[in-house]
């Protein structure tokens, strides 16, 4: 099993640096060079290590073309994960939808809703909910979705069951920070407490959770087993600086 990052970079030093870092970590990628600057994000951490983001606009990843190399990844994908942020521009949004249209019928399609600043609309969210079979969302995003779609009064579990049924999802993953996490599936509810750890920062914690959960499901683990491992890996990432620390072998066997 291997993963591939799909994006775009600019003809600039930042793009070169991004590829060098990915190469050093032996990560696979398909990132066409386009006539826009490589994307940047300014991250500020509060005293609890929780990040806020200033995400620059009009950058390379807003303009990802659907190339033959990207099509090749789509038609062979066992899983794909995308968010709402990458859909803020029409170009990349169309590429994402075209990618999804080329995936196999049994592909795990994970919509990590990833609400950032004001870079989302009800229409974009609805379209992705229709196209995914797994939703990953956090408790703050769930509140926002409840307000957007007219069910703010429901408690978190009932909101999750409602979304799961309305969009015919296979699974819904809800993370609630220090208050634990849930996985909902038809007839199944899994809850895991969040381990108490010394937090360096939480950048990358959500993505490591999603990636671990996805890989575990693809390997045939049960929802409960995948959930347990995802919680452990996410907690470990919180103890490290940066979004992509080396994961201990005990979690990758």
Give short role names for the model-derived ranges.
Residues 2-84, 102-105, 253:
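Conserved N-terminal subdomain of the carbohydrate kinase-like
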Residues 7-10, 113, 176:
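Short beta-strand/turn micro-motifs composed of small residues
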Residues 54, 145-146, 237:
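Residues that scaffold the ATP/ADP-binding catalytic core of kinase and kinase-like folds
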Residues 69-70, 125, 160, 199:
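Acidic, amphipathic alpha-helical patches
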Residues 72-73, 127-128, 165:
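Structural alpha-helical scaffold elements that stabilize or flank donor/cofactor-binding regions
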Residues 79, 83-158, 180:
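Conserved beta-alpha-beta core of the PfkB/ribokinase-like small-molecule kinase fold
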Residues 149, 153-253:
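Conserved phosphate-binding/catalytic region of the ribokinase-like
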